[in-house]
């Protein structure tokens, strides 16, 4: 592809699926605070008046799941019965079991370096030089729009905003480089009394224009703001939410492939999460070192086995080295065994709830250790 149009979407922290992700990761963080070796596979379901937390957890500590759920929902912004969902009075049900011993025997090991993969599967990591964060521009800016919406809502700058929202950014590419924004779609839940005309003007002037590069906005850019005309009913009242249902929002906005496994609610022995973070770390350092303009990494595993089954690199014709040469460099300088990934990226720290909204990649927070560019020099 040389000249094309590409679209990615993001959703707010008040979107039902993201609420579920955040609850699952908050449970995980609370366990890791007191039991860094805890095994967690936590799934959340949210719907009208109800939150159900289930999964498999093996830990030496106790966590108050009901309190975690209520606190997180209120923090997100569902703290008013008029919104149709209120963290202080919704029902909370938990159904938690221990991790299967058949799975545990594959990942339990006195030598942490030889921890086996918690399951079979493949993961992908991606980086490109379209943005300073080495993320694809469409998903990067879609996330920024949602962060801006949440900021204006929580700071009461636009007091009629409510928690549920979605964004979509369509970019025009020429010679494989983003040159203009073709369209912006932004839907936000709102107070019933706000007029559509005032809402559209405020969203464009207060959310979109301060967030997106002005050089990419022009007279041909299309703005589609709350296209149905009304978005009062939102959150779990309008749609059920489930952990792991926004895997493309969580990753690269469709610009790269995805192994299919979600991230949230999983401790780092689950390669769906830890190896995907490692794959991003590798791809970002490859691009950061100038070895390629775009890089996609695939790593695959077998349950109970520490060493990867395969490692694959694709640079889409943007590297002076062959894909095979880059793969050789990767295997020389990156240890992709789960135990080594956990140790190198410090993945037993309680850092996960902040990953559960606005993307797991391309973030500047120090806890996002997989975003470090500390292997650039040895790859050059």
Swiss-Prot record:
Transmembrane parts of this sequence: none
Compartment(s) where it occurs, according to its Swiss-Prot or TrEMBL record: Cytoplasm
InterPro entries: ADOMET_SYNTHASE_CS, S-AdoMet_synt_C, S-AdoMet_synt_central, S-AdoMet_synt_N, S-AdoMet_synthetase, S-AdoMet_synthetase_sfam
Residues reported to bind ATP: 15, 164-166, 230-231, 239, 245-246, 266
Known catalytic reactions: L-methionine + ATP + H2O = S-adenosyl-L-methionine + phosphate + diphosphate
Keyword entries, A-Z: ATP-binding, Cytoplasm, Magnesium, Metal-binding, Nucleotide-binding, One-carbon metabolism, Potassium, Transferase
Cofactor binding mode and count: Binds 2 divalent ions per subunit. Binds 1 potassium ion per subunit.
Pathway: Amino-acid biosynthesis; S-adenosyl-L-methionine biosynthesis; S-adenosyl-L-methionine from L-methionine: step 1/1
UniProt cofactor(s): Mg(2+); K(+)
GO molecular function, one term: magnesium ion binding
Region (Flexible loop): 99-109
Amino acids binding L-methionine: 56, 99, 239, 270
Positions annotated to bind Mg(2+): 17
GO cellular component: cytoplasm
Gene Ontology terms describing biological process: one-carbon metabolic process; S-adenosylmethionine biosynthetic process
Function, as annotated: Catalyzes the formation of S-adenosylmethionine (AdoMet) from methionine and ATP. The overall synthetic reaction is composed of two sequential steps, AdoMet formation and the subsequent tripolyphosphate hydrolysis which occurs prior to release of AdoMet from the enzyme.
Family, as annotated: Belongs to the AdoMet synthase family.
Subunit organization: Homotetramer; dimer of dimers.
Record-given protein name: S-adenosylmethionine synthase
